[in-house]
């Protein structure tokens, strides 16, 4: 999948040049062709075994940009303690975007002067602590850990992850207070240094005295084409959370900033609006036991040392924790022409059992806290009404999506149906598509025995959080075995079938993950092979089965998958898993020893137990705990493809932290991850059904840079309460921010598994990570294409474009043939851009294109003489031909192409171009007049049903082709 994304980017490099030159529609695909792919086309991430299941709903078109609206399903298995979102268990609504934050240490924006050391305590203000040449030396680490005023402040930057419009990545603050971005395309991150106050009441909390710290207002991310994406900006677009049981003491933290605005370079905008919903909660079970800790010292009677011991074991009931979340829900998306509204309703779905809250309620009742229990759920903080207050926790479901035009007419809609019963988790059952009041196509979904899933916090989950149908009592000797995966129960609740509007269906057959290798206790040291395969929690795809008729008799196994290293030898009997578990599971630590820094003779030995295993360290890549180095995809005709991926066992191990204070170590401590390097395709081999190799493709990669973020965890604690003898702990580590990008593809074609014909393609990138050069093997030589973009030139226009982060446009493109050390220029094209400030100060358009063959002088091939007030090209010369384009429907579509005419000729007949174009409906009478009066011109005209498609094309001879759509906006007749 990563390679597919990169190849898409290579194609887009050409679109940046030619997409601005107007081209009228040439044809439309047939209704049959437009319905292809309605079943069975389910791409799979072979490395993780997770199929990409997506239901496309609608594409919002804004000029040349498309904003897809879809639903996607994450088919990795069901974690029963994770609450479903508003479109049901496993499903996500894909539209707009979000920036989500992982808080490290304390929030980067933390600044509350009401607390001692709270002023400017977040990393955003404290970044300079890592702006030292010896930041990763143990001596400096200990200085920070032992200094109260330093260690009590944030030394570990938060991670901000983004996902919008096909862009995914993360950004983190550097030690120089700059935003460093990791993304496969160049993105600029801006924070406007503004903050927003928390929008929740302070009554009944310590905030009445101390207040809440304000959060980052939001961020603006600019993509390489200059389009700006604004996140946050108002509190209704920001989600917050705090500790569920310590609501009176904790402070609200901003966790997510939602996309509120897209600003295109021509000034058009897409506005996203949100509503603040009722509070919800995410609860979890977290048992932490002190199994016995004590000090050791040898000071003698003249130098008495602190002596203390501890032991603390609690029940399951005392170990429930959680977060109170203040969610937001997308209300609508608005453009100048379209309004998409999202309607939600309260659900009746399964809720957390009251027993989860009762223990903490009992503790509160016997305490003298002085603040109400669960105060944010109380209507009146002076009236305790537990447990009725739990009803203030309300979950919602998305019930309808309504797409309306600027007149308010319903163009298209989707009605979502769920099981929505109090005994089960919310699950999406069907999507009904509506159009102009008609009930139409239906997608429906079937799941594997969802009624078999346990209640929330059943204490019946495996090491990775998946259901295993086994209770896990706190018996330390046997606890590991209680948490082992159960293949049978892993299947409950997973999506099994999608029924499509065409009547066909796709069935999914899943199987548990397995692995043959795992990392050593110190994950950066080695990848160890086991004597046999072991089962892991979660699911991977085994088979995809299609039926075009919806009948079992027509079932066809489209694809079958084998995650093994010995398939070539043993075929379907292959047994040796290629899976690697990204870490070891450990719950008990019996020999963790720390030494005092201010008394060298004192040590503290600790034994600990934690029910939360080492999940933060048990990851391979792409958020999965198991990654597969080798995968076989067997197709319906018995041909098969062998895929090999980068993984721990072929050179992509993580690295240890730079410095660690204490000698004893646990898997909990930070490390330097290289997960960005894992999961990339390095070899693909295509075989016949008889096992004969027909094609081989290998892929090479490089790191885009050596960039990394500095990070530090540091602090100290007292050896014993009430003493000044203390021990320090700390780690410095790196967060790599480079991209792992493809630099070479080599493909070999085989006639009979021997004497292959081999060719390669090499890629070179510029300083912004955009494609600079492609070199292909051709005809005993190499064909090389070079791109020079705006940052290679110092003209005022190019500098202005770079300043506005418009980096992708190509200024010069050249093609050469290289053979025997000689380079021969084949073709050169130059693109000249001009600013269209009458539209916006961010819009630049191609004014002219010059081309030359070999070493001949450049000749003008295209020139745009005039643009309208929206930036559309209206009068051009291509070669020797003058062409006028008439735009209509408020500048949205080309309604006429007039060849062999000038703008003056056209405006002399119909009036000004802008007056014609701004009308909601074109004056086709004026087009008829043009056909009559411009005898030597060739006029081709187009009509449209706005936001649906083209309805007719009439050529210069007066011959017309008509297109008809059904009420659900699908093309049905030509």
Please tell me what each predicted stretch does:
Residues 1-22:
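Bacterial Sec-dependent N-terminal signal peptides
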Residues 10, 92, 134-137, 141, ...:
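Intrinsic-disorder-associated interaction segments
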Residues 23-77:
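N-terminal-proximal low-complexity accessory segments that begin disordered
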Residues 41, 618, 927-930:
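Short, P/G- and charge-enriched loop/turn segments at secondary-structure junctions
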Residues 58-61, 78, 82, 88, ...:
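Non-catalytic interaction/targeting regions
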Residues 70-100:
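Acidic, aromatic-enriched beta-alpha/helix-loop junctions
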Residues 899-944:
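Extracellular/periplasmic ectodomains of large secreted or surface enzymes and adhesion receptors
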